[in-house]
Amino acid sequence: MFFFPLFLFAQFDFNSNCREAYRSILSLHFTEAGKILNAEKATHPFNLIPVYLENYIDFFSVFIGEEPSVFEKFRKTQELRFDILKKGNMESPYYRYCLGNMRIQFALCRMKFGEYKSAALDISRANGDLKENAQLHPDFLLTNSGLGLIHVLAGVIPDNYSWILRILGLEGNVQKGLDEIAVMAGYAGNNKTYQLFRIESMFYLTFLDATLGKDANNALWILKKFEDQKTSFPGFANPLLIFIKASILTKAGKTDEALQNLQEYHTSSEEFPFYYLEYLTGLNKLNRLDPDADLYFIRFLKNFRGQNYIKSGYQKLAWTFLIKGNILKYEEYIGKALNRGALLVDNDIQANREAKYKEQPNIILLKTRLLSDGGYVDRAIHLLMDQSVKSVVKTPKDLLEYNYRLGRIYQQSGKQSEALKYFGITMRDGADQSWYFAENAALQSGMIYEQNKEYRNAAQYYKLCLSMKNTEYKNSLDQKARLGMKRIKPYLP
């Protein structure tokens, strides 16, 4: 009997079985996808695409579920998969594409768990794989989406870890990355070979644009462009895109549309649970001041086994009772924010601060904030203006927030000069405070000036934002200010 090494046979064949499994994975039907992949491995044991797609299942399980034990399992299985894939046909465009994408997926998971240093190294290695693939196979456009994601991720790695990427010769460029992903998403819509990968490109493009872009409406425009072509976009209403669309609508202050979109989601026992959608539903209902918002936060906190947005979930649950006037329930739930969850995302850090220092929000200002965030600007204006300043403002923090809220409401109403006036008052009075109001006032002022093409003024306020030392939402505010500076850099003398 003759024995031949695996690499003589191992190939990358994205055949019909693999395509069907990929569709199931993006619909979060992992059990069904696993059955298809097992059948494919039995029929074509030397096809390595099933190994790559199994990595997708683990990636989404970790990225959505955030369970530490699942992440540790993923850490071990991915190394085994790398060893198998490296025995494949090096001449195939899928060889480096698969290796690079697997590194990106693991980097994203590492970032979820705060492993930024290791994530930076993974991003650098993925960049090497995909850059080489682009040189060897310039017509293989799937590579563009991965490179775009790398450029975005390299641009959002926290400052205290970004030096690793610079030493390795990789500079982040968020806008360049978004453009590269957009090219892939647009091309895939008109090309049968790549159409299958359009959902994944859209997942990255819309999510990153909504998270990092200066204007959520731009992400809405992108999503609408592809939504108009549903007939050529099978699987549009899958859970991932419901999540993306709802996230964008939430950021854009389109609460009613976000809730309508979230109602399209109906989980089943065959589908991997996406509990964050309960949190997102609760958040939108809270922004609308719906009395049943608490039910969704309770379901999220009861079922989710991850670590992010737990503290924020307890805070938002506490707020649902605070705006109803139930102070005892507010104190009960805000207290729980100290004992569960991690301190990796700004929302959780801010929730932890509120619990630790017992900074109970001013109810009128809280309602104004929620209505404003939800896009109900008229309701927010009436709520704030129907009260005398003395009846609302009780503390120095209240006065600072009062002026900040006026600035935000005027900004949303298109009254830029009034917005800048109240942002200026907020910056003057709050620059040395640890609350986020002054720093975000500086950021929003920079965005107004950028919108008006007054780039020197925009730079002044972006730099002011970065110089402030508040401890609330610091990472995201600084990140947005840095991105603003990068956008306007070509227009500065």
Show the residue positions of the predicted features.
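Solenoid-like repeat scaffolds
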Residues: Q11, N38-P45, N89-M90, L136, ...
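Generic helix N-cap/helix-start motif at coil->alpha-helix transitions
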Residues: Q11-N17, S92, F140-L141, D159, ...
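Short coil/linker segments at helix-helix boundaries
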Residues: F12-S16, S24-I36, V51-S232
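Alpha-helical segment of the N-proximal tetratricopeptide repeat
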Residues: S16-E32, N362-R379
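Residue-level recognition of tetratricopeptide repeat
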Residues: Y22, Y56, F63, N101, ...
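Structural motif corresponding to the intra-repeat A-B loop/turn of tetratricopeptide repeats
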Residues: S27, S61, F106, F113, ...
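Alpha-helical repeat scaffolds
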Residues: I36-N38, V70-K87, S118-K131, S162, ...
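Alpha-helical adaptor scaffolds
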Residues: F203-T206, A210-T211, F243, T250-K251, ...
